[in-house]
Regions:
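Low-complexity, proline/glycine-enriched hydrophobic segments characteristic of transmembrane helices
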Residues: 209-223, 230, 574-575, 581
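Solvent-exposed soluble domains appended to multi-pass membrane proteins
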Residues: 236-625
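Transmembrane and membrane-interface helices of multi-pass
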Residues: 2-210
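Generic structural signal of hydrophobic/aromatic residues within well-ordered alpha-helices
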Residues: 12, 30, 112, 119, ...
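Generic alpha-helical structural element
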Residues: 74, 101, 118-129, 221, ...
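Short coil-to-helix leader/linker segments, especially the first N-terminal amphipathic alpha-helix
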Residues: 219-245
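Short coil/turn linker and secondary-structure boundary residues
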Residues: 107, 123, 224-227, 239, ...
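Short alpha-helical interface patches
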Residues: 106-113, 122-132, 205-213, 362-384, ...
Length: 625
């Protein structure tokens, strides 16, 4: 080996030694981000995702090249812990919401205290593997000898910073541009956060989310342009045009009793296990009612509160976080408000903490005169997260009798809440081979709630309270998280499941019962929680001005739009997180046509219209003009 070669080798080794902490940080964070990606998407390991992940870490690393090694080692150690905690939070959030946590969602973190059992059940011991390197790094840091390379002057540090930053930014820009070219509105709308994370990596996602949050806050502090306001007004006017004749005014003057059932998912209806009906009472009442068997939930970060929000306002959930929390200062043209204009009394019933999901604020905002919350009930029996559905419905019935007619009463149940671990409270129900599984526990929980709902509805009928009342009952959201999809597929005898098999099971039951069991039958129209208020507005002869949904009884449209950008028109189903279309009848993949592409862009526009309405409190402005 000649002297020149030896010189360059020594120089290379010195540079490696001088930057060993940066190299080690890059490798550790890369492994962690890739492991997270594998957890949210089994097909995550593909060549394209390496580039944005490495680039995002290079951008982080570049800033630390300006510091002395002794100082930056400590800073990198702290950053490693911070990123690890973010990844752990992300994966726990994903297990329940099937989404990536955002800055807006973090604002709702205090709400998790009310469902601590749910959160704890989502934590896996393996999650702490994200922190395992910390254990080994502490002793290594103590023994690590810092290099005092006096030759490394400030100018060289700046050059290294610029070079590392430019390489990272160049690679990152290419990756982000490729995504924006494939789906032009994805980055600005964040409509499908899982797919975006899959394409550009977790660090990039959170950086873009933070940027969007800040820029949106700044943008929303200014008034929306007159042109944009007019565009939204024109859409609302067209969407709410109606020449409805089917059941128009059929419920006018009648009481409305609306029941939102916790985690009531559609697959349990008319289903048996070991020869026993899972929901015998709901099955019986469905046969006496108008039943909608293709009714989808569309909740996002607000979960149960989103179901309430859509059903009472026909506006989409917040882009991020919960509308009940983020937009409690807005004005609404809610179902309760419009019924009050017709001299209805309005009351909401839910036995959980009044402040949970900000209900104590949002119920009055939406026009409810009374809110019977936790402190309005005698907590004499607990099942699940709080007061049992049995006691809740019995006490609610007594309160209903005191309301001046006509009234709108909105009841939200609780006992069948995830993680369905109160099997003793649920009582005996033989689930056979599913004993001890999450699905088995859920079947016990929903069977219990079904029994209480049956008793409640039977009492309403027996006491002739249904003679002048419309009853609406629907499920709020999914029961089986995607982490447990194999249990659901096994129960439904589905082999080689596709993404379409998953999405077609994201339906919830919804039925409308009329006095004397009138208008009973099955409506197969593809519909959703966004469509409930417009449908009831037609039946109760209420004004329709600010609704983004459709009247199911007077529409042949199968439009259902989900917050993540997925949609169906009743014929095709677009799954946004894989950018794939399926034929609804056959379940087979189909190619994107120009018509489907145009629909996708239009539906994303409608989501953005809803966001603008909420962000700029437009209903207040529209009503004032």
């Amino acid at each position: 080996m000649n002297d020149k070669t030896k010189f360059y080798i020594d120089k290379l080794m010195l540079n490696i030694r001088d930057n060993l902490d940066l190299i080690l940080f890059l490798i550790i964070i890369y492994v962690k981000v890739m492991h997270y990606g594998k957890q949210i998407s089994p097909d995550y390991f593909y060549s394209k995702v390496n580039r944005p992940i490495i680039a995002s870490i290079l951008i982080l690393v570049s800033f630390f090249t300006l510091f002395k090694q002794s100082k930056r080692i400590k800073m990198l150690f702290i950053l490693d812990i911070l990123i690890s905690l973010i990844l752990i939070s992300d994966i726990i959030y994903f297990r329940y919401y099937k989404d990536v946590i955002t800055v807006s969602a973090v604002k709702n973190a205090k709400l998790l205290t009310g469902v601590s059992a749910s959160v704890k059940s989502l934590i896996n011991v393996k999650d702490f593997l994200y922190l395992i390197d910390i254990v080994f790094l502490v002793p290594i840091m103590k023994k690590f000898k810092v290099v005092n390379n006096n030759k490394k002057v400030f100018l060289r540090k700046v050059c290294m910073f610029m070079m590392t930053l430019l390489i990272g930014v160049a690679i990152d820009t290419q990756s982000v541009y490729a995504v924006s070219k494939e789906q032009p509105t994805l980055i600005s709308s964040m409509s499908d956060r899982v797919y975006l994370t899959k394409m550009i990596g977790n660090i990039n996602f959170h950086a873009i989310d933070a940027y969007n949050f800040v820029s949106t806050s700044i943008r929303n502090s200014s008034k929306l342009s007159t042109e944009r306001e007019q565009e939204i007004k024109d859409f609302l006017a067209k969407n709410n045009e109606s020449t409805a004749t089917n059941l128009k005014g059929a419920a006018e003057g009648k009481n409305l009793i609306m029941i939102q059932v916790e985690a009531l998912q559609g697959f349990v209806i008319n289903q048996k296990i070991n020869g026993q009906e899972i929901t015998p009472n709901l099955n019986r009442w469905i046969n006496k009612s108008m039943y909608f068997d293709n009714y989808f939930y569309q909740v996002a970060g607000g979960n149960t509160s989103d179901a309430e929000f859509m059903s009472n306002n026909s506006l989409y959930p917040a882009e991020s976080g919960a509308a009940y929390y983020s937009y409690s200062g807005d004005s609404y043209s809610s179902l309760a408000k419009e019924l009050k204009e017709k001299q209805y009394g309005t009351a909401a019933f839910h036995a959980n903490n009044e402040g949970f999901w900000n209900r104590n604020v949002m119920y009055p905002v939406q026009g409810f005169d009374k809110f019977y919350g936790q402190h309005s009930f005698n907590i004499d029996e607990n099942v699940g997260l709080g007061l049992s559905d049995k006691s809740f419905l019995n006490q609610s019935l007594d309160k209903l009798k005191t309301l001046k007619q006509p009234y709108y009463s909105f009841l939200v149940t609780l006992s069948s809440h995830y993680p369905y671990d109160d099997t003793k409270g649920y009582g005996d129900f033989n689930v056979g081979e599913y004993e001890g599984t999450l699905l088995g526990n859920y079947l016990k929980g929903i069977h219990y709630t079904d029994e209480q709902l049956g008793t409640f509805l039977d009492k309403l009928e027996k006491e002739k309270m249904l003679d002048n009342s419309i009853v609406v009952l629907y499920g709020d959201h999914f029961a089986i998280p995607k982490d447990n999809e194999q249990e659901l597929y096994k129960f439904e005898k589905i082999n080689n499941a596709t993404d379409y098999d998953w999405v077609k099971y994201q339906k919830v039951p919804m039925f409308i019962h009329f006095p004397g069991d009138e208008n009973k039958g099955v409506n197969h129209t593809y519909s959703s929680q966004m469509d409930l208020y417009p449908t009831l507005a037609n039946m109760f002869n209420l004004p329709k001005q600010y609704m983004l949904g459709k009247d199911i009884l007077n529409s042949d449209s199968g439009k259902v739009i989900f917050r993540n950008g997925s949609f169906t028109n009743g014929k095709a189903f677009y799954v946004s997180w894989t950018n794939t279309y399926y034929d609804v009848k056959t379940g087979e993949k189909i190619a994107e046509t120009e018509a489907l592409k145009a629909e996708k862009e239009q539906y994303l526009k409608e989501l953005q219209y809803s966001d603008d309405i909420l962000n700029h409190n437009l209903i207040k402005d529209f009503k004032g003009k």
